[in-house]
Amino acid sequence: MFDEIDIHILEILQEKARIPNAEVARQVGMAPSAVLERIRKLEERGIIEGYEVRLNPACFHQGLSAFVQIETDGTDAQTATSLSAIPSVQEVHQVVGPDGFLVKLRTADHTTLAKILQQIRPLAGVKSMRTQVVLETVKETRRVDLTEHNGNSRH
């Protein structure tokens, strides 16, 4: 499904998505047109889902992170859709166990957090909630560990 060159290209793009194609080609030792074709195929296959800018949440008065564990009554599809529609909600994960969902959200402060929780509480399917406020984020990434795929890393 992947070869070593694909893995190397993916490692480079995960490090810096805006790197010029010519630089990727130089690093993998291929012609820019061949690298561009590989990247296009990785995109078509859904391996590369997209490219995005990571913003500093504190610069937008969203420095407070919280995780909300939500127990549901079984109407999970409707609950997931409703949770996903809340702008401060960044992630919605359906989980195994007594909780139906684990939700990550960002907001300005505790007052705003309380308002968002008041939006969540009456949603269809929500039975109970437990909230954990993040004191400090030690690591946060969307990178995929490619060393498990090919057994080694170039870093």
Cite the ranges covered by each PLM segment:
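A compositional/biophysical signature of low hydrophobicity enriched in polar/charged and small residues
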Residues: 1-155
